[in-house]
A protein has these predicted regions:
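A sequence-composition feature that detects small, non-aromatic residues
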Residues: 28, 35-36, 51, 56-58, ...
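Alpha-helical structural elements
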Residues: 9, 25-28, 69, 84, ...
């Protein structure tokens, strides 16, 4: 699996939940989920994820690309693939849509909350994979709780990520680079 360069992941966009590659802008993204019935015949919605809207990933040669294949999902458990363009979840109207989904419990609560953070909170997506290491190294101590970070904490993590040494960088090079970049 190709790893996204650190500077690219910090800049902007979202990581595709299917292929792991960059979804560079709102128009390139799609949010989808699966609707089916549970064993008692009650509606069950699951599998909320942010993926590439069109087949842009070399890892997914199928026509559906990173998106769920509706035929496969129906065969598995008579599931129906539902979704909306990523831009529907952005901005004030997108926040209202996400809040309505939370209020109506249309989708699993934790999945909707995580999507809201990814789309609505500046820097959250870029900092997400870095936060665990940043907390363990004392870069931040979350004021609210794990998974819920203030903007100052997110920006501290992103600044730290730009200056932290890689396995190939000596401590002296790291210190010099950080001094220059401030």
């Amino acid at each position: 699996m190709r790893v996204m360069p650190r500077d690219k992941s910090i800049r902007s966009g979202w990581r595709c939940d299917s292929c792991g590659q960059l979804v560079p802008d709102l128009q390139a993204g799609w949010v989808e989920w699966l609707a089916a019935e549970d064993t008692r015949g009650k509606p069950k919605v699951s599998g909320l994820r942010l993926v590439h809207h069109r087949n842009t990933s070399a890892r997914s040669p199928e026509s559906y690309g990173c998106r769920y294949n509706p035929r496969d999902e129906f065969r598995k458990n008579r599931g129906i693939v539902e979704g909306l363009a990523l831009d529907r979840f952005a901005g004030p109207d997108g926040l209202m849509l996400l809040l309505s989904m939370i209020a109506e419990r249309e989708l699993p609560l934790q999945e909707v909350i995580e999507l809201a953070k990814r789309v609505q909170i500046p820097g959250y997506e870029a900092a997400y994979e870095l936060v665990h290491d940043a907390v363990s190294q004392g870069v931040i101590a979350p004021c609210i709780s794990s998974g819920f970070y203030l903007q100052c904490e997110i920006w501290d993590v992103l600044k730290w990520a730009k200056c932290r040494p890689s396995a190939k960088t000596s401590q002296v090079e790291h210190q010099n680079r950080c001094v220059v970049s401030h």
